[in-house]
Amino acid sequence: MIIKTTDIGRWIKKGRMIAWALSFIAYHLSFSVACDDYLDELPDNRMEVTSVENVKKLLVTAYPGNESMLVAEFMSDNVDDYGSDNPNTSRFMDQVYYWRDITETNNSSPENFWEDCYQCIATANLALESLDGLKDQTTDSELAELRGEALLCRAYAHFMLANLFCQAYSPLTAAATKGIVYMEHSAEELSYNPDRPSLADVYAHIERDLLEALPLVGSNYSVAKYHFTPRAAYAFACRFYLYCEQWEKAAQYASLCLGASPETMLRDWSYMATMTQTFAALSQHYIDATLNSNLLLLTAYSAMGIVFGPYRYMSKYSHGQYLARHETSEAPHIWGSAPYYQGTHTYSATNLDKTIFFKLPYLFEYADPVAGTGYYRTVYPAFTTDEALLNRAEARVMLGDYDEAAADLTRWMQNIVQTSLVLTPQIIQDFYNGIDYCYSDDKHILSTVKKHLNPRFNIGEEGELKEAMLQCVLDFRRIETLQTGLRWYDVKRYGIEIVRRVINAAGEPETFTDILRRDDPRCAVQIPIKARTAGVEPNPRPTSIENP
């Protein structure tokens, strides 16, 4: 079988990224990236898939090299506007923060993520199509593992596209909600498939691929954490079924991921407290492939490391001290005054107000060392055990297993915070019922850690046990996933309203500018203009901005 592509630059770019990532692991940010040998193996316009090794190389490039984290994080309630006097922004960031249709293109733009994911899907499809002709070259078990990885790559890319470019999945509305094209053949072109299937159809295809892949996927890779392994696949299944509102399956796959001793699988926050307390050291450790908590690591052309690092870059929209002290990391929490093992870092100066965890590294690959030009890079965990644990807690709450959910919440809390407190359903309910809801003031701009929840599934009345425990889950998961974009999907799933406001020079909310309500059309990122030009139906948009 032959790969034919009119965009060979994407193949070369992806090959360079993988080679760079492996060099990063081996040389610990030496930046002396040696990828010429790998690139020499790439063709100028076509590649014959005639061996199992060809398929393995294909699948290395079936993971997205662009990310949606930056767009998702800045569309969420994890950032505030620091005013028109702050010059550290761009038209792209302005569009993202205010939920406008994004016309600008860069490595983190929806257009690049869309194109990259569909390229990954085409690659996975080509691998699947090639395997049947290679049965005489290897064992059945190796072919099965390759098939499992290809199916997972195809399912994952579609899942990420659907969650960014569509409304949140609900079994009550999915049949009538626009999805994205599910590509099952390597030669397909999106322009040939302008009609968007329902979101229900897309999720059914994702589930089909996921269920077929789960018993097949293996761990026989040179660097396993950069590929789907069984644990990473279970974490994917857990998140998928959580978003599908299939709570028993979400809990089941989380348990398979975490094993019999979840505490041993979580991030080593206590060890990080003993490390050199620099951004470089801590962020490199955060994405360490030897950590049990990191299940699938992906490389990306991305500015996430500099945007959420100790820099002024794009600081007009920021997770600043007001958000941290009232809604997220530094706010009054159920554990009281107990400190984090590895806390946040605050930077405050003219046009700079950031409170951040040191997570994703800021890496730079020089294309021209003399001119000082090149690419922003980062490495990030697409799935972690810590997220899986909190996902299981949510599923257990929805199943009415409140004691087990409280046990999971305790595990997460005691791992990140220096406390011996053991949470119970009653302690959780009492704490969250003692907090006012966010935006309860006359101007609708002041913050607390508790927001009104408006999901389509039943969570009981406000103040009841189920609602209070979900407040705890969402509170903990918001801290856990800060700076990774995942909070945006909780906002969509739970119909959480977001108020856009301007923070004044005193660091307090002053001016209301916009509000995003449940099912606002802007919750679905607009289909990229190239796809719309080819005939793909755009997402609807509101006719006016609503006042609170």
Residues covered by each model-derived region:
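Membrane-proximal, proline-rich intrinsically disordered regions
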Residues: 34-83, 321-322, 326, 495-548
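Aromatic-residue-lined binding/catalytic grooves and analogous aromatic/hydrophobic interfacial grooves
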Residues: 35-36, 231-270, 531-547
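Conserved, well-structured interaction surfaces
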Residues: 93-166, 197, 212-218, 373-380, ...
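Inward-facing hydrophobic residues that define packing positions of alpha-helical scaffold repeats
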Residues: 121-124, 203, 210, 254, ...
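Hydrophobic-face positions in mid-chain alpha helices that act as interaction patches
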Residues: 251-386, 419-460, 480, 486, ...
